[in-house]
Curated annotation (Swiss-Prot):
<keyword id="KW-0547">Nucleotide-binding</keyword>
<comment type="similarity">
    <text>Belongs to the poxviridae poly(A) polymerase catalytic subunit family.</text>
</comment>
<feature type="active site">
    <location>
        <position position="192"/>
    </location>
</feature>
<dbReference type="InterPro" id="IPR024231">
    <property type="entry name" value="PolyA_pol_nucTrfase_Poxvir"/>
</dbReference>
<keyword id="KW-0804">Transcription</keyword>
<keyword id="KW-0067">ATP-binding</keyword>
<keyword id="KW-0808">Transferase</keyword>
<dbReference type="GO" id="GO:0006397">
    <property type="term" value="P:mRNA processing"/>
</dbReference>
<dbReference type="InterPro" id="IPR024398">
    <property type="entry name" value="Poxvirus_polyA_pol_cat_N"/>
</dbReference>
<comment type="function">
    <text>Polymerase that creates the 3'-poly(A) tail of mRNA's.</text>
</comment>
<dbReference type="InterPro" id="IPR038337">
    <property type="entry name" value="Poxvirus_polyA_pol_cat_N_sf"/>
</dbReference>
<dbReference type="Pfam" id="PF03296">
    <property type="entry name" value="Pox_polyA_pol"/>
</dbReference>
<dbReference type="InterPro" id="IPR004976">
    <property type="entry name" value="PolyA_pol_cat_Poxvir"/>
</dbReference>
<feature type="active site">
    <location>
        <position position="194"/>
    </location>
</feature>
<dbReference type="Pfam" id="PF12630">
    <property type="entry name" value="Pox_polyA_pol_N"/>
</dbReference>
<dbReference type="GO" id="GO:1990817">
    <property type="term" value="F:poly(A) RNA polymerase activity"/>
</dbReference>
<dbReference type="InterPro" id="IPR024397">
    <property type="entry name" value="Poxvirus_polyA_pol_cat_C"/>
</dbReference>
Length: 470
């Protein structure tokens, strides 16, 4: 056994390593040295500054914060489990390697914010938005509580931090949803801030430690198997703090976005299509039944943005939207006629089962499928003027053989999202799909085709219990 490795492990573990510990941990010596040489005084100072700036009303003293930090950096001395030691080393390495650049930088002087003149007061759109939502408000109110509705008291503090984070890291992190629309229209209320970023795991681990060191309470990261590259941070009462989708850099580059007050948000045109698509998901219609007014102001803001940005006239005149679609129950495939538009395909096969799509793409022997990850929740393949894609929401039926217009429009919106992501033609179909929302009567739901059931285990990062599962 190497004397230098043995000495390093001895100093780190606070005891002489066993032979098993030596052989299992010797590959981690470089990381261990990085942890041991880490300037914890500077780190403690950064945490205190983060606390003062973003968590000022939380009652924890500087000495308590220091104790929480020092205790964690000595945690390896209280276990002999190799699995736990690996977890502690991995998490400590992430902290010492990335915290300063990810969250510590937020304590330095803020760069100048270039105030945006993009503000919308969509008074004229509220009536249109209200009428649209009234016509699709066809679900009954559900009493089940979704995880996104069970929010932590820490959300306000984390939102304050996120506003600064989005400005400092606007090349790698963008936002969408209610907060992004609040930046366009300050009358919109928001809860947590929805984000897409290229280093989601590192960010959330650092944030988890910041909260733990300030509050002294455990927080936990969960990876959900049925959402691609998604992680959620929950507090010690299992309440939602923040979640984040991770995307590759090339996907981030493809996302249409606009800059408001030094923060990049997903282009509201794309967000409008996403909203139309999500109305096909029965859960979202149940949310609408609970609070139509909340959705009205969001939709009105999106419509006003699109009207001004693209010069779209809202008069209800439309002939080709939603695109004609039929459903094959046995194959669980929606077939869409896209021939009326200037697309690179004439027909779309929209699969409700992702594995079936993957299998058929393999059979086609095609290797040019494009994956936009959770931005579209699907790959897209164009082959012989046919699009192959996956739709991750429920499909609503208005009769046994007829797709409900809400879902037909949702599928059409999904296809238009591809057009925008690939810089294809979309203005005429965009105008059509928006106008297809207007002057409609309610159509009851006859049947609901369930969405794809994803299997798999939840991944967990539990700092308190030294657990990382994938």
């Amino acid at each position: 056994m190497s004397n230098s490795i043995t000495l390093t492990l001895k100093n780190y573990l606070g005891r002489m390593p066993t032979i098993n510990e030596y052989h299992m941990l010797k590959s981690q010596v470089r990381n261990i040295q990085k942890i041991m040489f880490f300037n914890k005084d500077i780190f403690i100072s950064l945490i205190k500054k983060n606390k003062k700036k973003f968590f000022s009303e939380i009652k924890s003293s500087p000495s308590e914060i220091k104790t929480h930090i020092l205790e964690y950096f000595l945690k390896q001395q209280k276990t002999s489990s190799i699995g736990k030691l690996y977890t502690i080393i991995e998490l400590q390495t992430i902290l010492v390697s990335s915290y300063t650049d990810v969250l510590g930088v937020l304590t330095t002087k803020s760069p100048y914010v270039f105030p945006s003149n993009i503000k919308y007061e969509p008074h004229s759109m509220k009536k249109i938005a209200h009428d649209i939502l009234t016509s699709i408000n066809v679900a009954t109110i559900s009493e089940k509580v979704m995880g996104r509705h069970n929010v932590s008291n820490l959300v306000t503090n984390v939102n304050l931090l996120m506003e600064e984070y989005l400005r400092r890291h606007n090349k790698s992190c963008i936002c969408y949803g209610s907060y992004s629309l609040y930046l366009l229209n300050p009358s919109i209320k928001y809860g947590d801030i929805d984000i897409l970023q290229t280093n989601s795991r590192i960010f959330l681990i650092n944030l988890a430690f910041l909260i733990k060191f300030i509050t002294g309470h455990n927080v936990m990261l969960l990876k959900v198997p049925y959402l691609k590259n998604y992680m959620v941070l929950r507090d010690n009462e299992d309440k939602h703090i923040i979640d984040s989708f991770n995307v590759r850099q090339e996907t981030m580059h493809a996302i249409p976005k606009i800059l408001i007050d030094n923060i990049y948000i997903v282009d509201p045109t794309f967000q409008l299509l996403s909203m139309i698509k999500m109305f096909s998901q029965i859960d979202r219609l149940e949310d609408l039944a609970k609070n139509q007014e909340k959705a009205t102001i969001k939709l009105a803001t999106l419509l006003e943005y699109v009207r001004i940005k693209h010069g779209i006239i809202l008069n209800g005149n439309v002939t080709n939207m939603p695109m004609p679609a039929s459903f094959n129950y046995e194959k669980r495939i929606v077939t869409v006629d896209a021939s009326k538009y200037n697309f690179s395909f004439k027909k779309c096969f929209v699969y409700l089962d992702e594995n079936s799509l993957s299998s058929d793409i393999l059979d086609l022997n095609a290797d040019d499928a494009i994956d936009f990850e959770n931005v579209s929740n699907s790959v897209f393949l164009i082959n012989d003027e046919v699009m192959y894609t996956y739709f991750s929401n429920t499909i609503l039926m208005s009769s046994k053989n007829e797709i409900h217009e809400i879902s037909a429009r949702g599928v059409s919106a999904h296809i238009l999202m591809y057009q925008i992501l690939t810089d294809g033609d979309f203005l005429i179909p965009l105008s059509d799909i928006i106008n297809s929302l207007m002057f409609k009567e309610k159509t009851p739901i006859f049947n609901i085709i369930p969405r794809d059931k994803k299997t798999g285990k939840h991944g967990i990062i539990n700092i308190e219990k030294d657990i990382i599962t994938h």
